[in-house]
């Protein structure tokens, strides 16, 4: 999400997440190694998540350019989208942490898209006036450790 703040909250964690365009490795010759425009990408089949935070940001960016995107596949399961990209030809817009291994292993390619660098934030809050349990503190500790490992 975008950075949030309230006088009623304690922000226990905030981690910036880059959201990136990726494509099937089979599109490397056509799309890889160059700066693309969003309009150039729209000719490709898109495999996208349902209307969540990063998809909403992409749709806003497209609307500002008076452009819309109709995905070939829309699914709430990010791992399924990644598998579809790995076996078929398509493009997606996903958090870097979700696609990093597939890109490093050459199963997907990361695309450079002109004027479309987007970051969102993973955040954990607690209410200042409410009790925080040991279990909640442990959850935050584990979440921070997971971020450090990435």
What does each model-identified segment do?
Residues 12, 39, 82-83, 137:
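Alpha-helical segments flanking ligand/cofactor-binding loops in enzyme cores
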Residues 109-150:
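A late-sequence structural motif
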Residues 10-20, 105-119:
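Short beta-strand->loop
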Residues 54, 59-111:
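Hydrophobic hinge/microswitch elements
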Residues 1-44, 53, 98:
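Acidic, Gly/Pro-rich loop/turn segments at junctions of secondary structure
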Residues 29-31, 43-65, 132-134, 140, ...:
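Secondary-structure junction motif
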């Amino acid at each position: 999400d975008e950075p949030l703040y309230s006088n009623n909250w304690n922000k226990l964690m905030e981690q910036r997440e880059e959201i990136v365009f990726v494509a099937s490795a089979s599109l490397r010759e056509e799309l890889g190694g160059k700066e693309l425009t969003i309009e150039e990408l729209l000719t490709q089949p898109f495999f996208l998540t349902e209307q969540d935070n990063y998809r909403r940001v992409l749709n806003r960016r497209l609307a500002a350019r008076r452009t819309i995107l109709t995905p070939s596949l829309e699914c709430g399961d990010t791992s399924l989208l990644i598998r579809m990209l790995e076996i078929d030809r398509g493009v997606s817009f996903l958090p870097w942490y979700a696609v990093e291994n597939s890109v490093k292993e050459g199963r997907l390619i990361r695309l450079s898209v002109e004027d479309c660098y987007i970051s969102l934030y993973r955040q954990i809050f607690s209410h200042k006036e409410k009790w925080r349990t040991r279990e909640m503190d442990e959850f935050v500790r584990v979440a921070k450790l997971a971020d450090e490992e990435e």
